[in-house]
């Protein structure tokens, strides 16, 4: 499971500080990608300890039959947006969308992502809808509707972040993990963790005074107990959060 990190940072303030402390100047963005597994990457701990008001972490396996190369590592970054995707956009035969030459892709948007994968294609479709004038959350929803016309059973779970906003979407096409995904996990000796591959959960974040100040959204891979405040993000729902105030709401697509 490789590591990719994008953080919206403003040292020395922490992402858990009260919203009123977030003032200009605008925070700097840090982007790091590696093909190393996070547990073996010496930079991982540095990023984990780095204060930030918002961030995306992508510690996932690669899509089926796609190469483990730096260009495909996430987060992707384009037009001031960071994007991560947990899914495999393939048809019932397991043929990935990157091999579908007939699928219409905006080459300019695709090249701007810097990637070559199905996730890069997904991001490029979102970028198109943003260029059409849609708000960030609705651009994500429109992109999923478009891709589902050709790939209805694929997973479109994703997160996208701007300087001001975070959108996290759960949009799986199957109730159970497909055998193909289980096989990929088995290859890495992680087959027992494939059952909740498409599950996303979230919980509130509190500041030092115990007041709500943000939200954490995560996919599977570590314990997310209800007793600790974790709630399931239902299928076809998204969280839309402010990176400035920490306020968020849940909407359907």
What positions do the PLM features span?
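N-terminal segments that mediate ammonia production and transfer
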Residues: 1-253
